[in-house]
UniProtKB/Swiss-Prot annotation:
GO MF terms, alphabetically ordered: hydroxymethylbilane synthase activity
Entry's Gene Ontology cellular component terms: cytoplasm
PANTHER family per the UniProt record, alphabetical: PORPHOBILINOGEN DEAMINASE
Domain of life: Bacteria
Entry protein name: Porphobilinogen deaminase
Pathway terms, separated by semicolons: Porphyrin-containing compound metabolism; protoporphyrin-IX biosynthesis; coproporphyrinogen-III from 5-aminolevulinate: step 2/4
Cofactor (UniProt): dipyrromethane
Entries under Pfam families matching the protein: Porphobil_deam (PF01379), Porphobil_deamC (PF03900)
Oligomeric form and interacting partners: Monomer.
Keyword terms: Porphyrin biosynthesis, Transferase
């Protein structure tokens, strides 16, 4: 089996985790599964926000082409970076058990985000995080801040900004949880749909791969992400739209909280939903329709 992945430390850590789980599930030797790192346009373009150069697809196009061509058997992704519409013939077939979905703040002087002094600078390239920062702390200057985890932490250490945000899950997978100075409450600072979950993309109808992947599917994560990605898809979510959403599963019940914001954070509309897990996708779609109705028909005009 060949696994395609981006070449960053985090992407490779996620691919190695997937390989280990496959080995454990099927008793496979390490050399039975090959990891193929690939460079993507999103990795090469570091000087502009994703919203200006093509959105989330920049991190997946080359890998998905390799999957369609049969050069790899599966692709391992951070689900929050995946578009809701995938290339024909491909699907996100399995989600691994979710890590902590919260956003982590790493502060250089103030340890807690809300304790930053007036006029402090915070680095982030995520429109959702930028909008939430401006909503909660309009006095803070938000600067565009791209690069992999190491690059962002190095910029922070160099004093370019007073703090930055990263996904808690990614830091934990890299063994860097000790750099976190504050974990944001998702009811106040809601994460991106899919944040903290590893998604495995494969070819539709590839029965051999489906059998191998089946033991890796985590029930609660699969259900939660069906709801979150339905919400995102119904709102045409991309890197151009500040959208947050988190679903939690307890037994046969699901709870969801979603939010849409303007990039300046001045307007925000929040929606909640509860129901049975079998209706996960429908709950997400309904929540999207309700929050769109709250916001009005012109909410996305001019900045999407």
């Amino acid at each position: 089996m060949k696994i395609g992945t981006r070449g960053s430390k985090l992407a490779l850590a996620q691919a190695y985790l997937t390989r280990r789980l496959l080995q454990e599930a099927h008793g496979l030797p390490e050399d039975a599964i090959e990891i193929l790192p690939m460079s993507t346009a999103g990795d090469r373009i570091q000087d502009r926000p994703l919203s200006e150069v093509g959105g989330k697809g920049l991190f997946t196009e080359e890998i998905e082409q390799a999957l369609k061509d049969g050069r790899i058997d599966i692709a391992v992704h951070s689900t929050k970076d995946m578009p809701t519409v995938l290339p024909e013939g491909l699907h996100l077939s399995v989600f691994l058990e979710r890590e902590d979905p919260r956003d982590a703040f790493i502060g250089r002087s103030a340890r807690r985000f809300m304790d930053l002094p007036q006029g402090a600078t915070v680095g982030s390239s995520s429109l959702r995080r930028q909008a939430l920062i401006r909503r909660l702390r309009p006095d803070i200057e938000v600067v565009m801040y791209r690069g992999n985890v190491d690059t962002r932490l190095r910029k922070l250490d160099a004093g370019e900004v007073d703090g930055t945000f990263l996904a808690c899950a990614g830091l934990r997978r890299l063994g860097l949880a000790d750099v976190i100075t504050d974990l944001l409450d998702p009811s106040v600072f809601p994460p991106a749909p899919g944040q903290g979950a590893i998604g495995i993309e494969s070819r539709i109808g590839d029965e051999r791969i489906d059998v191998l992947l089946a033991p890796l599917a985590h029930r609660e994560t699969q259900i939660a992400l069906a709801c979150e990605r339905a919400f995102l898809g119904a709102l045409d979510g991309s890197c151009r739209t500040p959208i947050a959403g988190l679903a939690t599963v307890e037994g046969d019940r699901l709870s969801f909280r979603g939010m849409i914001l303007t990039p300046d954070g001045r307007q925000a509309h929040e929606v909640t939903a509860e129901g049975v897990v079998s209706d996960a996708a429908a709950l997400g779609t309904d929540a999207a329709n309700r929050v769109r109705a709250m916001a009005g028909p012109h909410f996305f005009d001019g900045w999407q």
